[in-house]
Amino acid sequence: MPLFATPFAQLDLVRQPEQDGEPLQAFDAADEYLLNQLHERGVTAQCRVLVLNDAFGALAASLAPHVQVTSSGDSHLGFLALRKNLARNGLDLGSVRFVPASETAVGPFDHVLVKVPKTLALLEEQLIRLHGQLAPGAQVVAAGMVKHLPRAAGDLLERYIGPMHASLAVKKARLLIAEAAERPQPRSPYPTRYRLEQPPLTLLNHANVFCREGLDIGTRAFLPHLPRSLGALRAADLGCGNGVLGIAYALLNPQAELTLVDESYMAVQSAREYWRAALGERPATFRADDGLAGQAAGSLDLVLCNPPFHQQQVVGDFLAWRMFLQARDALAAGGELWIVGNRHLGYHAKLKRLFRGVEQVAANPKFVILKAGK
């Protein structure tokens, strides 16, 4: 892989999770453009820089030796990538302060560098939280590859930060540059809520939760077929999102012990708050993690999963395959993985390579629900 070379550093970077023969870089031209623009403006060791949505740590690791860096994002995998890339390049792990997107990064900040996320609601929430955290004269610069940079991103900068102009495109990347100006205290529209008829629940969704405005069709297909009356099993909702699968299962199985895990901090926050609203003080474990990587081997009896098929703008089944491997390791003998997936993804064949037996529980023209026994 090529090195990431900018006026600040020359770094050897990897993506997270790592894959053998990884064809994709851990940085793009938008990262390079952001750092070149910041270098042209000039920074000192006293400059306070906030980096938002730094996918694999390219921006924060480049700046760490030169300024005071805070990094914030909604991906625990991104946090792990940052730590790995700092260590990989001989940089102090403490040189970058990391703040999960479920919390507010406290300034004041002189510069804010933003990689525009796929979910504009996340960008909006992040810009709202910058209110009161910017130093006088601060500049907020958002960047993305032109093909992934919506016009609405510039509108959000104008609304919440100040006057904005777009740069020329360089290597198919563009900057949106906003100068901080007086703005009234904004009111966040997040979290959002919607009502589920069966089971009768009101779902809570922070800004970056998948299908924030309504239940996704895969989960809708899965819910009527959740296992029930299984007793005190140790169950996990893997990639839990707002926690709807785990909470619906918990309602059907009052003795079950639940763990809800997602790599999104906002998803875990949503699941925790939703659980308390639906189930009160019933104990459960909530964790932002790299799937079940932190789960002890053989410590679960059941895993429920609606696996993702994309990481940022990259589409593929590598994350689902990794989740299946993690579930197999975390399940005790006789335990089961239950999943929902698009028919065309061929999960049945993949699961047969990992599990003792695979059965179809239900299907419709678009989705299939499978259970795989260890």
Name each model-derived stretch:
Residues 124-136, 321-333:
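A short glycine-rich, Lys/Arg-flanked "PGG" loop and its adjoining helix->strand segment in the class I
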Residues 30-90, 94-95, 217-305:
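Conserved SAM/SAH cofactor-binding pocket of Class I
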Residues 73-77, 145, 262-267, 319, ...:
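Short beta->alpha hinge that forms the Motif I/post-I loop of the SAM-binding pocket
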Residues 266, 303-328:
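Mobile active-site "lid"/loop adjacent to the S-adenosyl-L-methionine
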Residues 109-115, 300-308, 338:
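Short SAM/SAH-binding signature in class I
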Residues 159-199, 209, 342-374:
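Class I S-adenosyl-L-methionine
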Residues 137-145, 334-341:
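Conserved beta-strand signature within the Rossmann-like core of class I S-adenosyl-L-methionine
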Residues 19, 24-28, 33-40, 169-233:
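SAM-dependent Rossmann-like transferase core, predominantly class I methyltransferases
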